[in-house]
Swiss-Prot record:
Cofactor(s) required, per the database record: Fe(2+)
An individual GO BP term: tRNA threonylcarbamoyladenosine modification
Name of protein: tRNA N6-adenosine threonylcarbamoyltransferase
Pfam families found in the cross-reference section: TsaD
UniProt gene name: tsaD
Function, in words: Required for the formation of a threonylcarbamoyl group on adenosine at position 37 (t(6)A37) in tRNAs that read codons beginning with adenine. Is involved in the transfer of the threonylcarbamoyl moiety of threonylcarbamoyl-AMP (TC-AMP) to the N6 group of A37, together with TsaE and TsaB. TsaD likely plays a direct catalytic role in this reaction.
Gene Ontology MF term list: iron ion binding; N(6)-L-threonylcarbamoyladenine synthase activity
Keywords from the named record: Acyltransferase, Cytoplasm, Iron, Metal-binding, Transferase, tRNA processing
Record's catalysed reaction(s): L-threonylcarbamoyladenylate + adenosine(37) in tRNA = N(6)-L-threonylcarbamoyladenosine(37) in tRNA + AMP + H(+)
Length: 341
């Protein structure tokens, strides 16, 4: 089965072609970072308009790179949620129009299920069951995964997601959008131990997260340094390191608890924050101690992309699932409501 995948949940337009027998044939991505950077964050209306502009050229590009014609596509998968409603509607409308024109089925994919399954595109994919840490700008969740659609939520953020905390903290410190890579870049030059930030919600049982207080603590520390006349680049680097260490250690502690609670030895990390090298190293060290294994997608498939949507959609299409002709999206959507296959 040859599936065209479309991703438009936020500020990246992703398109890919996935073959159920040959794997990923081609993928293309257009990022809107430069468009939104001047505003310090994503402007939903601008995101939607840019998706409209980029979608068809990217589809033509992917078909050409794969050496395929539209008539060879067997189905279209698209991100149906969660995400920005206008951006989602662009992808859904395009997918349903193409499916109607080509006489093929369409299927809406849960954005976070796409992230969760992205490591399946690698040469050594994880085997079920496993624990998944989903860390992105909108989500921080620990999920027990027994199969596609068989998800048990173990814990989640009660306020800011980890990626959101990175972006907001960076903005408060005067760094460029998106903030995660900027903080990681500065942290490489930071002085270990100069600042020590709290590890939120690690002093109590449970697997939930909270990063809003850490964001405020970081801002207060930065403001105190500035008030004392120390707003040097080195101080900025030291604070970035302390913040990143706090987030990484908090996530690692919670993942260790989740593995112990479930008795599993395999951990998948997915979502934009999973590209953070400090987080990867920390989790790899922890899994080595537990004699387990950690899995993640290659960096370009950690952020939003069409390949993960094409793959996830292909699995559901092969199981006989597809949508009707109605154009419908779900800006808020729990993965636990997805049917198992």
């Amino acid at each position: 089965m040859l599936v065209l995948g479309l991703e438009t949940s936020c500020d990246e337009t992703g398109v890919a072609l996935y073959d159920s027998e040959r794997g990923l044939l081609a993928d293309a991505l257009f990022s809107q970072i430069d468009l939104h950077r001047v505003y310090g964050g994503v402007v939903p209306e601008l995101a939607s308009r840019d998706h409209v502009k980029r979608m068809l050229p990217l589809i033509r590009q992917v078909l050409a790179e794969a050496g395929r014609e539209p008539g060879q596509v067997d189905a279209v998968a698209y991100t149906a949620g969660p995400g920005l409603v206008g951006a989602l509607l662009v992808g859904a409308s395009c997918a349903q129009a193409l499916a109607l024109a080509w006489g093929v089925p369409a299927v809406g994919v849960h954005h976070m299920e796409g992230h969760l399954l992205a490591p399946m595109l690698e040469a050594q994919p994880p085997a079920f069951p496993f624990v998944a840490l989903l860390v992105s700008g909108g989500h921080t969740q620990l999920v027990r995964v027994d199969g596609i659609g068989r998800y048990e939520l173990l814990g989640e953020s009660v306020d800011d997601a980890a990626g959101e905390a990175f972006d907001k903290t960076a903005k408060l410190m005067g760094l460029r959008y998106p903030g995660g890579p900027e903080i990681a870049r500065l942290a490489e030059q930071g002085t270990p131990g100069r600042f020590v930030f709290p590890r939120p919600m690690t002093d109590r049982p449970g697997l939930d997260f909270s990063f809003s207080g850490l964001k405020t603590f970081t801002l207060n520390t930065w403001q105190q340094c500035r008030d004392a006349g120390d707003d040097s680049e080195q101080t900025r680097c030291d604070i970035a390191l302390a913040f990143q260490q706090a987030v990484v250690e908090t996530l690692t502690i919670k993942c260790r608890r989740a593995l112990k609670q479930t008795g599993l030895k395999s951990l998948v990390i997915a979502g934009g924050v999973s590209a953070n090298q400090s987080l990867r190293q920390s989790l790899e060290t922890m899994l080595a101690e537990l004699k387990g294994q950690v899995f993640y997608a290659r960096p370009r498939f950690c952020t939003d992309n069409g390949a993960m949507i094409a793959y996830a959609g292909c699995q559901r299409l092969l199981a006989g699932q597809h949508d009707g002709p109605a154009i419908a999206v779900q800006p808020r959507w729990s993965m636990e409501t997805l049917p198992a296959i």
